[in-house]
Amino acid sequence: MNISDVAKITGLTSKAIRFYEEKGLVTPPMRSENGYRTYTQQHLNELTLLRQARQVGFNLEESGELVNLFNDPQRHSADVKRRTLEKVAEIERHIEELQSMRNQLLALANACPGDDSADCPIIENLSGCCHHRAG
């Protein structure tokens, strides 16, 4: 298979595939006599794993580690599960941070009259001001 075939099958761009190769995240493809990359089912599996790992929140390094585990016949599912649960905990922390930000923004928006006056509790709060501007 050539790179355009692999791109269609995996849903990745040719540029992304080359990037993953440059970063050493996938097994290097063989080269044909004319210098074109030749891909196998193994490459499809690795690239699909990378794409899907990225979609569920794993960063590049973590995704590469998952590819390494995929290629390791001696891997332990406990390692994969541990990494997955660590990612879940990280996502949960991020959700809590986002919810806190959302609540803070809603409180600011509720404190703002949203009228034609220059007084804006949102700006005052975010700028650290504690007094209204003198008129």
Swiss-Prot record:
Binding, Cu(+): 112, 120
CDD domains reported for this sequence: HTH_CueR
Known DNA-binding region: 4-23
Keyword flag Coiled coil: no
GO cellular component terms, semicolon-separated: cytoplasm
Residue intervals passing through the bilayer: none
UniProt keyword annotation of Transcription present: yes
Compartments it resides in: Cytoplasm
The entry's keywords: Activator, Copper, Cytoplasm, DNA-binding, Metal-binding, Transcription, Transcription regulation
One GO molecular-function entry: DNA-binding transcription factor activity
GO BP annotations listed: positive regulation of DNA-templated transcription
Annotated HTH merR-type domain residues: 1-69
Pfam families: MerR_1
Protein's job: Regulates the transcription of the copA and cueO genes. It detects cytoplasmic copper stress and activates transcription in response to increasing copper concentrations.
Complexes and interactors: Homodimer.
Entry note about domains: It contains a N-terminal DNA binding region and a C-terminal metal binding region.
Protein name: HTH-type transcriptional regulator CueR
Protein source organism: Escherichia coli O157:H7
Gene: cueR
